[in-house]
């Protein structure tokens, strides 16, 4: 039987009844109070005030939005979806909004704004407050901006990584090697992880891969894997999958590995700021937290990739290696071709289709995805001692060709909850070449933007099916790529943008 609401006459002057408003504010907790609310007046709360709410053993700090009219009663406090989840609230729960304690660590953020070096203790204090949700998005933006560019030195990068690890969960795999691989990113369709993990696991090495969802790309590895099998596994479930199969491909966010990183990324994305120190801390904090011992870094280099020059790649590679070694990781960095997308599909389901084609050894499998996966799998096998120096590629190729990789992938998917086929978009339309000539270049960033406008990764079936590669000759009117969308509106939106970006696939007209 549902508990009746508390009579208004029994409410104390500082208690408000909670309402779930169903407002999506992404990950930012937001509190809504009426302009005539007695607590607003007694506490001096104004719009954008930071307000602390406690319920049972949970406490959150939310940003206040003040409303008028009949949207909310003066004796009610409304919560966004993010705030509701964090507080673990039920309709009608009573709370007493209050001012949060001053955030002492903001002094360290101000110091960094003025160029001061931050100690381990200072960075730890900041990250603890970030993870506890005490920072508003404006305060998070100040920290991210203060650390942007090259403002974090190597010592601060190590300190940031350690603080981010300490703020979350850690997985302990006991004795033995734990292999891992990470791609720096910026290359659409580069879904090699889902081919590498079953190859490596089939050769007897452990590879429990915790992957991310898309941040600025049309698909992350977790998004793509989720079209084939469940990825929201807790630590106990991950351990069972790895004990049974030797590997997994799961979403790291489900097990709170380096939760501060997810919070900082939320603010970094709209600011579009690059920070080598934060990038290195983001990558390595999750590797340390995941219990990895050996980490292979795939670093695509190209004019429209995330890393645009060999010099920048060398600098980032050295920093990753030095920080990783300080944290007890064995590191290996491989620079790869970042000139064009990998495979044909861009978007979760389309990339999953390519992965399945490679693992099943189908004639339609994209050769570049297969070759790149085998090269990196070979590096991991040599790194872990499963193959002699120079013999990794041959072993990886044999495991893929004889079906062992496909069987292992099926085992992993079954252990994670079952293998399924990726969805297909209901709405598709091709974009054609405006002239005959050779494909000179493909702009990774523009192509990724078009795929996102089509609905990826939110709509798993959405994205782009690429039909041409650099160096190929195309005729006028030949399809360059096909847009996939879940709705006609998203398809039209993506087509409009694609039409305005004629050089996304740069065709050089023959003289």
UniProtKB/Swiss-Prot annotation:
The lineage of its organism: Bacteria, Pseudomonadati, Pseudomonadota, Betaproteobacteria, Burkholderiales. The keyword Glycosyltransferase applies. Signal peptide: none annotated. HAMAP family: Thymid_phosp_2. The keyword Signal does not apply. It comes from Polaromonas sp. (strain JS666 / ATCC BAA-500). Its EC number is 2.4.2.4. One of its GO terms (biological process) is pyrimidine nucleoside metabolic process. Belongs to the thymidine/pyrimidine-nucleoside phosphorylase family. Type 2 subfamily. This is Putative thymidine phosphorylase. GO terms for molecular function: 1,4-alpha-oligoglucan phosphorylase activity; thymidine phosphorylase activity. Coiled coil: none annotated.
